[in-house]
Amino acid sequence: MRTFTPKPSDTERTWYVIDATDVVLGRLASQVAKLLRGKHKATFAPHVDTGDFVIVVNADKVALTGNKEQQKLAYRHSGYPGGLKATSYAELLEKRPERAVEKAIRGMVPKNSLGRAQMRKLKVYAGAEHPHGAQKPQTFEITQIAQ
């Protein structure tokens, strides 16, 4: 018997919506990365994109443990010498909360063309509304013990 290799055309992609209200950022990111990669499916293969689409709503209400809001920094670079900018997560969550969630998830997917394709299936919104109602997304509950 030969080893089964899934084809991208054979993969059925489901849409999931996740409410990030009071969910710890790292726990949220690991669950979303698992759905994006397709690791929850029996047909998972590390070299094929078998993941699902994920919509994260209420990104502005995500929780950070400890004193990370003030201490943890998010870096970006302009590409010019001396162009490294650092922003605290408190400021990032205030101005661009969807970027904070995307940055956490990006660190948990592969750093290659497959990871970039998986990140394109991620949609993050700061508020409770999203424009993907036509896809009929299923609710995905993240169960966590007290933070």
Curated annotation (Swiss-Prot):
Alphabetized GO MF terms: mRNA binding; structural constituent of ribosome
GO cellular component, one term: cytosolic large ribosomal subunit
Keywords of this entry: Ribonucleoprotein, Ribosomal protein
CDD domains recorded: Ribosomal_L13
Xref: Gene3D superfamilies: Ribosomal protein L13
InterPro entries listed in its UniProt record: Ribosomal_uL13 (IPR005822), Ribosomal_uL13_bac-type (IPR005823), Ribosomal_uL13_CS (IPR023563), Ribosomal_uL13_sf (IPR036899)
Pfam families: Ribosomal_L13
Biological process per Gene Ontology, one example term: translation
Protein family: Belongs to the universal ribosomal protein uL13 family.
Quaternary structure, from the entry: Part of the 50S ribosomal subunit.
Role this protein plays: This protein is one of the early assembly proteins of the 50S ribosomal subunit, although it is not seen to bind rRNA by itself. It is important during the early stages of 50S assembly.
Name of this chain's protein: Large ribosomal subunit protein uL13
Gene it is expressed from: rplM
